[in-house]
């Protein structure tokens, strides 16, 4: 089979009350895939769409859809932790939603400083994050969670000097079982 890329456009319409679908098929060539400067237009666009699909727009970490599509059925040895921002509703109610957003961004920044590039941070919603650290030893995993808690406690929320962050963290080790 050829390694070609095709664009297919389908249009529904009716002729004398009979439903029909017209399909237009177009084979994409290098002019459609690569611009004059040699950039890969289609692949760059697809990568951008994938990032929009799987990234939380506020924090930039993976989102719940990424978890559902890629992580929950993953079967491996990993440290898995749920991280929940304490008093998040209070920050939003007392200081406003911008303060809550800044608190979430601060937490993500603190977590990223403590983990490897192969580890995954997923914002499940609101102030809940899932952390997946594949192939980590349990002793190191426990130390990482303590390091994260300490780093978050010491973090400053830009523009909101009175906010003192703390998180609740629960962690388990998976042994050849799904993350879910």
What positions do the PLM features span?
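Per-ARNT-Sim (PAS) sensory domains and their PAS-associated C-terminal
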Residues: 1-7, 16-19, 161-163
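Conserved nucleotide-binding and Mg2+-coordinating catalytic segments in signaling enzymes
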Residues: 47-69, 83-97, 105
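Active-site-proximal alpha-helical element of nucleotidyl cyclase-like catalytic domains
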Residues: 99-120, 128
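Short helix/loop segment flanking the catalytic signature motif in cyclic-nucleotide metabolism enzymes
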Residues: 103, 130-147
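A short pre-motif secondary-structure segment
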Residues: 120-123, 163
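A short glycine-enriched loop-to-beta-strand structural element that forms part of the catalytic core
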Residues: 132-134, 160-180
